[in-house]
């Protein structure tokens, strides 16, 4: 099953901050890059500067690292 924009997916990359979290596909690149699927999440990760709220809420994944829900 091909993943497309707007699909809800579960992350299956064990080293990812969002492992087993559900996100929404923001875009899928078809140019042949290694991690073509951009996934957006509700919560942010830990990459914000000290004392500043926020962080990243998107990340790139390969289709094999995602499971449609």
UniProtKB/Swiss-Prot annotation:
Gene3D superfamilies: 2.30.30.50. Keywords: Membrane, Photosynthesis, Photosystem I, Thylakoid. It comes from the Bacteria. One of its GO terms (biological process) is photosynthesis. It is found in: Cellular thylakoid membrane. It is a peripheral membrane protein. GO terms for cellular component: photosystem I reaction center; plasma membrane-derived thylakoid membrane. InterPro entries: Elect_transpt_acc-like_dom_sf, PSI_PsaE. HAMAP family: PSI_PsaE. Stabilizes the interaction between PsaC and the PSI core, assists the docking of the ferredoxin to PSI and interacts with ferredoxin-NADP oxidoreductase. Belongs to the PsaE family. This is Photosystem I reaction center subunit IV. It comes from Prochlorococcus marinus (strain SARG / CCMP1375 / SS120). The lineage of its organism: Bacteria, Bacillati, Cyanobacteriota, Cyanophyceae, Synechococcales.
């Amino acid at each position: 099953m091909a993943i497309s924009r707007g699909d809800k997916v579960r992350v299956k990359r064990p080293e990812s901050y969002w492992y087993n979290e559900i996100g929404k596909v923001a875009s899928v690149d078809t140019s042949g890059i290694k991690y073509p699927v951009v996934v957006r999440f509700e919560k942010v990760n830990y990459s914000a500067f000290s004392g500043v709220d926020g962080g990243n809420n998107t990340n790139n994944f390969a289709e094999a690292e995602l499971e449609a829900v």
